């Protein structure tokens, strides 16, 4: 680290770091706080920023003010991204909880998203086990276990065979 960077005020260094972090992808406020608090890897190993709690709050407030940090946008994009990867609503809720998103914000975003979870569950099952889906009990149990692991709800999984029988 050069002398000029080490002389920069902690607020400026934190703000620069926050913008760099948020330029890569959206983060929740809690994720950003955790990453800002972590030591920076410099040429001579980890380096701490001598920042006060007020500096962290000012950086977070600045990011909110300028639209870099928005938990509702983060939640909507996260749900869309994880559902495209084949994960179900239960797993997505759990991951959002781990990222510090409130249950209310998660539920609101889940209601607003326009995703057919039953169709996604069926797509995942056919991708893994082929078309037509097996009707033998032991095979159905394997599919059910797989889909539960992926985070789909039991009612969506049961709808696969209900609709399949029609």
Swiss-Prot record:
Q: Which Pfam families match?
A: RecX_HTH1, RecX_HTH2, RecX_HTH3
From the UniProt record, give one GO term of the biological process aspect: SOS response
Q: Name one GO cellular component term.
A: cytoplasm
Main subcellular localization, coarse class? cytoplasm
Quick check: keyword DNA damage in the entry?
A: yes
Q: Which UniProt keywords apply?
A: Cytoplasm, DNA damage, DNA repair, SOS response
Instruction: Using the record, list the residue span of the signal peptide; answer none if the entry has no such feature.
Output: none
Instruction: List locations, semicolon-separated.
Output: Cytoplasm
Give the family, as the similarity comment puts it. Belongs to the RecX family.
Task performed by this protein: Modulates RecA activity through direct physical interaction. Can inhibit both RecA recombinase and coprotease activities. May have a regulatory role during the SOS response. Inhibits DNA strand exchange in vitro.
Protein name as catalogued? Regulatory protein RecX
What is the species of this protein?
A: Escherichia coli O157:H7
Gene from which this protein is expressed: recX
């Amino acid at each position: 680290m050069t002398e000029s960077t080490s002389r920069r005020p902690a607020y400026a260094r934190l703000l620069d770091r926050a913008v760099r972090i948020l330029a890569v992808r959206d983060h929740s406020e809690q994720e950003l706080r955790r990453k800002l608090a972590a030591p920076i890897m410099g040429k001579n190993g980890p380096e701490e920023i001598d920042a006060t709690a007020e500096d962290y709050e000012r950086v977070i407030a600045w990011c909110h003010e300028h639209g870099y940090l928005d938990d509702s946008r983060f939640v909507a994009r996260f749900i869309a991204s994880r559902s495209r990867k084949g994960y179900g609503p239960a797993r997505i809720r759990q991951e959002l909880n781990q990222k510090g998103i409130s249950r209310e914000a998660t539920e609101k975003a889940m209601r607003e998203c326009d995703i057919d979870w039953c169709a996604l569950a069926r797509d995942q099952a056919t991708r893994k086990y082929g078309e037509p889906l097996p009707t033998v009990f032991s095979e159905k149990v394997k599919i059910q276990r797989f889909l539960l692991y992926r985070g789909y709800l039991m009612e969506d999984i049961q709808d696969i065979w209900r609709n399949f029988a029609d």
